[in-house]
């Protein structure tokens, strides 16, 4: 595969991580650049790791991923989105929110990288070498996630709790989109 093809694949896979990073960036107070880096490292690492797992697993997990992955992604994103909305409406109003604990980051990273697992499986079926695509996918996702977190912070700084609610709705909508795409392909 050419560099351009791998780059475009990386962009496509990184869009979910970008949206989730932007949503997360709206809720973190106080926001530090290290928060954006933490998001970027988690999402970039998972987006790079999942194709490798898919490539190794190949057809063994193919049926599970195709049947249950969209539901898992939907449930994880909907749960975290509802949690964000609840915290925006009823949470501590002192302006300090930090939703970047490792368990939340892990769930978000898994939910946004399940499609990369399927890409890895397709690489295995096609006999495509995995190293170059994985590096490019991870780097593109890192940059997109970092930029998404900064953009989310900038928007959240101006609109406060309204953007937290919007961020939660984005996560729920993203989960719904993943599920709807799966249902349309059945």
Swiss-Prot record:
Where does this protein chiefly localize?
A: membrane
The record, for HAMAP family, names: MntP_pump
GO:BP terms for this protein? intracellular manganese ion homeostasis; manganese ion export across plasma membrane
Q: What is the official name of this protein in its record?
A: Putative manganese efflux pump MntP
Topology in the lipid bilayer is annotated as:
Multi-pass membrane protein
Q: Keywords, A to Z?
A: Cell membrane, Ion transport, Manganese, Membrane, Transmembrane, Transmembrane helix, Transport
A Pfam family recorded for this sequence: Mntp
Q: Which organism is it from?
A: Methanosarcina acetivorans (strain ATCC 35395 / DSM 2834 / JCM 12185 / C2A)
Q: Which family does it belong to?
A: Belongs to the MntP (TC 9.B.29) family.
Q: Where in the cell is it found?
A: Cell membrane
Q: What molecular functions are annotated in GO for this chain?
A: manganese ion transmembrane transporter activity
Output the InterPro entries linked to this UniProt entry.
Mntp/YtaF, Put_MntP
Q: Per the UniProt record, which residue ranges are transmembrane?
A: 1-21, 39-59, 61-81, 102-122, 134-156, 165-185
